[in-house]
Amino acid sequence: MKIYDKNIEEFIDELINSLRKIIGDKNVLAAVSGGVDSTVAAYLTWLAVGDKVKAYIIDTGFMREGEIEKVKSLLESMGLQVKVHDVSELFYNSLLGKSDAEEKRKIFRELFYETLAKLVKEENADFLVQGTIAPDWIETTGGIKTQHNVLTQIGIKPELKYGFNLIEPLANLYKDQVRMLAKYLKIPEEIRERQPFPGPGLLVRCVGEFELEKLKALKNVTVLCEDLLMKIDASQSFLAIFKKPRMTTSKEIVDLIKEVKNITGIGGRGFKTFEFYEKVTGIKGDSRVYSKMLGIYYKETELLLRVKDEIVKAFPKILKNYTRIAIMVSEPRPAGKYAIVIRAVKTSDFMTASVPDVDIKLLQNIVDEVMKDKRITQVYYDITPKPPATIEYE
């Protein structure tokens, strides 16, 4: 295995030696989440300077149920000293009622680093290590979305603003390269092959206005469906929650349905279309856009799913103000406040991604579990690749 034409062992040795020179005899705090990026960054630093590293999990309240305890146990099994710092109430109180995606991400970033700054001071540390990788700063500097862990690349000087020096040993690597390092370092498979999880956690999957009830519903259905979601042949699969969308139509939508009928050979009526209230992130050219998402319902769901790629090719030419399209895979029920969207993608580098086919029985099993939560009224499967969509919604 090679990274940048270097033997992986040589590459790791160079990283470790570089970390030793930078850190010297100073103390280091490592921000860890249980993801492969932050774990590899923390573990490399531990290999370099040993117990001068203190690893912290910041409990923002946006992790999945039971995740923090599991992550702490796994990291400790590797030899790391791990502490959990609970600031969930602070994050909830600061974010309640906020609906703009960029505002939510920026509030999260500010609170996150203010918290870390206090911990760095308490631990008498000079450095903060984090697992920023290339797609994080590429998407942020390119204006696609603000990643919470990008500072220096956008002109923020952490030593002046927060009082610590930042170390990002993986900042020029991509996800597949980080996984190569993790495998060589014998990091537990549960971490190594863990699906990516955004730094702000479930906050960015509570799309639109943040409400505690919305978060509770998302946490609940995520627990119900976690094992089923892992059965999808995907690099990443997850659920996001939205306000119940409204029925809609327009000349462009009518034109799209005509095109869908041509693609599928369906005649007659039976289609319903829904517009989501929330704007979602998409990509046009090299720029980010916040645009609309359309939901399509037809009683023969399997028929629509079978031609999803053709629908995706057709819709951007017809619907100029939409960057995403999703197929309703449940029967709508009148009760309930929220809709759930299933998102699954296949990718090697997370810069582009396709949407996998999902067995209809598996999809129905996921729907059945989601609909056990009476707060949910509809379930959709997002069929939009990256681009024109991003993987996450905010």
Regions found by a protein language model. Name each.
Residues M1-E394:
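ATP/NTP-dependent adenylation/nucleotidyl-transfer catalytic domains that generate, transfer
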